[in-house]
A protein has these predicted regions:
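PLP-dependent aspartate aminotransferase-fold enzymes
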Residues: 68-82, 89-209
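N-terminal entrance/gating region of PLP-dependent enzymes' catalytic architecture
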Residues: 1-119
Length: 210
């Protein structure tokens, strides 16, 4: 009940973080090393006193202008269940309920964006940056030579990825991580509505093919 009251009061407040320096925050959490074991309740008490105080309060309506979502109270229950069950979506038998829920949600999203067909498949990942990395890795696998998984990209024709000039920086990083090279990421100009211009895209592809 106490935490619920704290949450309700905090979400109505204006302050979303403590204006402290890195050294000040570090000092709070640098517990003295002891030879004896630390009781779990002591650790929880310390976190209760300090972790909540010195963490950014993302659920606040005053927290905006950055990439993280606000979260919500029902999400706390979801995170609790996820940690308690500790499922591994390695294969169906290791996480049957999670696997079917994931497939259903992917179907929902596919229908929502108008990209649905019975053969649709996919997985949920931690966020957009990892999704971009995975997508480009899949493209590399499909478009690369047959032995790319064994011999790597050496001897393969240069691959290029075309994106809008407003694309996320994670795509640049993915090109670097996957060995495709940032110089092979071609960024196409956008119009006044920040939309990629198909005409310029076609022209650039023709230019590269020639």
């Amino acid at each position: 009940m106490y935490k619920r009251q704290w949450y309700s009061q905090k979400i109505r407040g204006e302050k979303i973080y403590e204006n402290k320096t890195p050294s000040e925050i570090k000092k709070v959490f640098r517990l003295e090393e002891k030879n004896k074991q630390c009781k779990p309740e002591d650790v929880l008490s310390h976190l209760d006193k300090n972790l909540l105080k010195y963490s950014n309060f993302n659920p606040s309506p005053n927290y905006y202008g950055y990439i993280t979502g606000s979260g919500n109270q029902i999400g706390v229950i979801g995170e609790f269940l996820k940690s308690a069950l500790n499922q591994n979506n390695l294969k169906w038998h290791s996480a049957p309920a999670n696997t079917e829920i994931e497939k259903i949600c992917i179907d929902w999203i596919s229908k929502f964006i108008g990209y649905y067909n019975k053969k649709n498949a996919g997985v949920f990942v931690s966020g957009g940056s990892v999704a971009n990395l995975m997508n480009i890795a899949i493209i590399r696998k499909i478009k690369g030579h047959d032995s790319i998984n064994k011999d790597g990209i050496y001897g393969n024709k240069t691959m290029r990825i075309y994106v809008s000039k407003e694309s996320h920086s994670s795509i640049d990083k993915a090109m670097d991580i996957l060995g495709l090279g940032i110089n092979n990421l071609v960024k196409i100009e956008v119009d006044d509505e920040f939309k990629l211009q198909p005409k310029l895209l076609r022209e650039k592809i023709r230019e590269d093919l020639n």
